[in-house]
Amino acid sequence: MNPISYWQRLKVAFQYVMPQIYMTQAAGWLAKQKWGAMTHFVIKAFAKKYNIDMSIAEKEKFSDYASFNEFFIRPLKENARPINQNPTALCCPADGRVSECGHIEDDRLLQAKGHFFSLNDLLAEDKDLTETFKNGEFVTTYLSPRDYHRVHMPCDGTLRKMIYVPGDLFSVNPFLAKHVPNLFARNERVICVFDTEFGTMVQILVGATITASIGTVWAGVINPPRHNEVKEWTYEGESAVKLSKGQEMGWFQLGSTVINLFQAGQVQIADHLSVDEPVRMGEILALKK
């Protein structure tokens, strides 16, 4: 790996000393304000800066959004993201870019070139889950500020468990993924465990700096409030939540990362997926073995 510059070192160092929680709380407060013309001006400037395509949004006019949060989790027009109908295929859960993907080497996942992190740490030291996914497959998808920020199901699934894991709020952009050790295993996250025809699948919504909230369609907003301990919910019998392939399952209010885990021998990651590959929700993510 090439050495990083002085300014890049400062950028990394700032992540460790900045008041992550307070910055995120401030961003969340600002994003939910309804300030009329000022809000519309900020939304328009943001869309221009990040070259956001509003033609696929259900509401194309900036003036149709009362707050920045409404804009950020804007729904798309019907059929803007067709769902691959191959019954042996899993589809991408979100728009974004592939941060990393491939084989889980025993208990190790690749975070960035030359940097690994622990499956056990990622799964909040849940021993049963860790054993379930050892030597399995994974895909990490980074959602940039310009991307659509609702998260969908790669396949039909029945929710069995949800785990909220408190943690840091480092930025998760590709540069910092290369320079902050154990980034995804130290950030705040929501772990969702599903039974599927492709075996047990986990979909993890990872928080980040100024990701003011993470929510799911069955539980609503998970955070805030933020907690200092791991919280777990189980869903059995009539309380089990059933979701269909392509159905929305959650969202971020400001960008972050989705990590998918699959059991060993169940799926093969799609051949076209590689690091920094742009993906759209609904495209092929993996195929049943």
Regions found by a protein language model. Name each.
Residues 1-289:
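Contiguous, well-folded functional domains in the mature portion of proteins
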